[in-house]
């Protein structure tokens, strides 16, 4: 394997996770691409240009290039409008490849269904296998919608079905996602490979909690709960805010110590502040304990995790949940919704607690169990570090490279059959 073309239409690996549409997928693309480059595999990532000031090609790391493809206006486009720009994006990708000798890429790896549509055509034009990672699935999301969330359109469902049918290999984060691909999308089980994501074990490590709190301006004896992620209905930060109100109603004395950190930005074009969540905190009378922080880079984010007594991941659906893994790698227990891949990322009663559903009282119970029981918290924290160390991006990358090799072999057999 010499060269890999990676497609990430709707979000650039250069963007800060936690802003707009940037999240765990960005981390996944960056970490696996750089790990491949360390193994001598050249990686070229194609993403949509969102500014006229972006260079046509940028170096993410030695051996990893990011190619900005002009497809539609640089700003003002919602993700839901991007299907209308797939023709322009695909043309840009094909033009870039045409500058090389035939057979330049060994495989194309698409991320999310929009990229899968582009990868489908690239597969046919370039004569190389297509490996696809969905990251989220419309049918799964529609089965677990938040009250304020809009269902995914039929257009996306059809697009995903097409990509699932055409890809040579489908990468699932967990066995649960693999079952969803075969059960909901009729994927050929032989094409589905389970490859768990990793965590940056050099960046997310246990550290001095007191120092972490000082860096964030928090009192040493504060009771700190944290949410990290994009502020959108799917991620359900409102669940933590409501649980905070329930905790204070049960024990008003906690107000002097309790700090709830909400770290992330609103998801969507043109949004600057999490207005609805701020309004909810005010209406529930907890605005004085809820602090909103912008998305944090790796080192600063690790300090947030270390400072917290517990990290809440109340999502309505997660294909895996990288935030849960990062927090545990820092020695912080996680309270997570028992959905999607989170039961794999968090071992219930061992590294954190899983909550069935999103009822406020259940979340308040789980958070108080950890935060108000130092013995339990320390036991979970110790186990969490060991659990997280079982996941690494190097291991993920080795599995992906093996999947690429399998896809190439199968593709060649089909071509020469």
From Swiss-Prot:
Instruction: Tell me the residue numbers annotated for binding UDP-N-acetyl-alpha-D-glucosamine.
Output: 16-17, 24, 230, 235, 296, 318, 326
Q: Quick check: keyword Metal-binding in the entry?
A: yes
Query: Which keywords accompany this UniProt record?
Result: Glycosyltransferase, Magnesium, Metal-binding, Transferase
GO terms in the biological process aspect are: mycothiol biosynthetic process
**Which terms does the record give in the GO molecular function aspect?**
acetylglucosaminyltransferase activity; D-inositol-3-phosphate glycosyltransferase activity; magnesium ion binding
Query: Which superkingdom does the taxonomy of this entry point to?
Result: Bacteria
User: What are the binding positions for 1D-myo-inositol 3-phosphate in this chain?
Assistant: 10, 21-26, 79, 112, 136, 156
Catalysed reactions, as listed in the record: 1D-myo-inositol 3-phosphate + UDP-N-acetyl-alpha-D-glucosamine = 1D-myo-inositol 2-acetamido-2-deoxy-alpha-D-glucopyranoside 3-phosphate + UDP + H(+)
Q: Which InterPro entries match?
A: Glyco_trans_1, Glyco_trans_4-like_N, Mycothiol_biosynthesis_MshA
**Binding residue positions for Mg(2+):** 305-306, 308, 332
Q: What is its EC number?
A: 2.4.1.250
Extract the HAMAP family matched here: MshA
- Task of the protein: Catalyzes the transfer of a N-acetyl-glucosamine moiety to 1D-myo-inositol 3-phosphate to produce 1D-myo-inositol 2-acetamido-2-deoxy-glucopyranoside 3-phosphate in the mycothiol biosynthesis pathway.
Task: Write down the PANTHER family for this protein, in alphabetical order.
Answer: D-INOSITOL 3-PHOSPHATE GLYCOSYLTRANSFERASE (PTHR12526:SF510), GLYCOSYLTRANSFERASE (PTHR12526)
The subunit field of the Swiss-Prot or TrEMBL record says: Homodimer.
Family assignment?
A: Belongs to the glycosyltransferase group 1 family. MshA subfamily.
Listed name of the protein = D-inositol 3-phosphate glycosyltransferase
